[in-house]
Amino acid sequence: MPLRLVFMGTPDFAVPTLLALSAYGHDIAAVYSREPKPAGRGMKLQHSPVAQEAQRLGIPVLTPKTLRTDEALAEFRSHEADAAVVVAYGMILPQAILDAPKLGCYNLHGSLLPRWRGAAPLNRAIMAGDAESGVMVMKMDVGLDTGDVAMAERIAITDAMTVTDLHDALARLGADLMVRAMAALERGGLQLARQSEHGVSYAAKIDKAEAKIDFARPAQAVLRHIHGLSPFPGAWCELPIDGEAVRVKILRCALADGRGAPGEMLGDDLTIACADGAIRVLQLQRAGKQPMSADEFLRGTPIAKGVRVSSS
């Protein structure tokens, strides 16, 4: 028999899971999401991607600023949920909320726990050069991503993969995993295992100060840095354009042959020297402009061989 669920999520990453649980036939009593925020040129209040999808599905949406009041707890309990599914909600759940559903609260986390607990597991996995990532369903407790694990799926991280690529792949994989987990919970057969005490690491929130590219690092490290911050906040450097240093974000690149001083342009195809080897820029973005391929950029803004790219 389908479960009665409360779904809690906010960004695009959570939308596939909401859709998959709804398509499975679970009774989603309510969707909790973060409050609307100003966005766009007019800075009008906009609901989160999850809230918009829930409204389209006809599911009641709640956007409380806190869950730590008696009123918020009473409202949450009023849904009489069998379980809560939490995917990138963006708010820490107090113990009283965790205890409210009959069968508990279950979180979809975008890493292979206990590695990369915390806010930015996808970015940190790519930036650290991890060979793989994945998604895990865990039964939540009051710790930071410390709950017992129910199910997991893995995915390889390639040199060509940006955070956007990994995000989209894990969102799809995670939706299927959560459907399987809730089906097992429905049957009474969901098995839990404690997380290992070894290999614990924390994925700190990305700081914009990290975005500056240091071409004095090895090419592989520069590539991982760029792909781990693409598209947001976007790893940047300054290109000499019309006599000025113009900041551009490099969104996608590849390892390339060549040697030179770090930051030196090795050709007319946006190949830039690093401490060892080089990277070739594949996609970039100027401030206020749309992302474009390197070929599109160079048609309007040729960059000569031998010039130096700065990241001051």
Curated annotation (Swiss-Prot):
Which PROSITE patterns does this one have? GART (PS00373)
Q: Which UniProt keywords apply?
A: Protein biosynthesis, Transferase
CDD domains, sorted: FMT_core_Met-tRNA-FMT_N, Met_tRNA_FMT_C
Primary enzyme class: transferase
EC number assigned by the record: 2.1.2.9
Do you know which Pfam families this protein is assigned to? Formyl_trans_C, Formyl_trans_N
User: Would the keyword Protein biosynthesis be found if you checked this record's keyword annotation?
Assistant: yes
Gene3D superfamilies reported in the protein's UniProt record: Formyl transferase, C-terminal domain, Formyl transferase, N-terminal domain
Domain of life the protein comes from: Bacteria
Q: Which GO terms describe its molecular function?
A: methionyl-tRNA formyltransferase activity
Q: Which reaction does it catalyse?
A: L-methionyl-tRNA(fMet) + (6R)-10-formyltetrahydrofolate = N-formyl-L-methionyl-tRNA(fMet) + (6S)-5,6,7,8-tetrahydrofolate + H(+)
Q: What cellular component terms from Gene Ontology apply here?
A: cytosol
User: Where (6S)-5,6,7,8-tetrahydrofolate is bound, by residue?
Assistant: S111, L112, L113, P114
Family the entry assigns: Belongs to the Fmt family.
Purpose of the protein: Attaches a formyl group to the free amino group of methionyl-tRNA(fMet). The formyl group appears to play a dual role in the initiator identity of N-formylmethionyl-tRNA by promoting its recognition by IF2 and preventing the misappropriation of this tRNA by the elongation apparatus.
| NCBIfam families tied to this protein | fmt
Q: Which PANTHER family match?
A: METHIONYL-TRNA FORMYLTRANSFERASE, METHIONYL-TRNA FORMYLTRANSFERASE, MITOCHONDRIAL
Protein name as it appears in the record: Methionyl-tRNA formyltransferase
Organism listed in the record: Rhodopseudomonas palustris (strain HaA2)
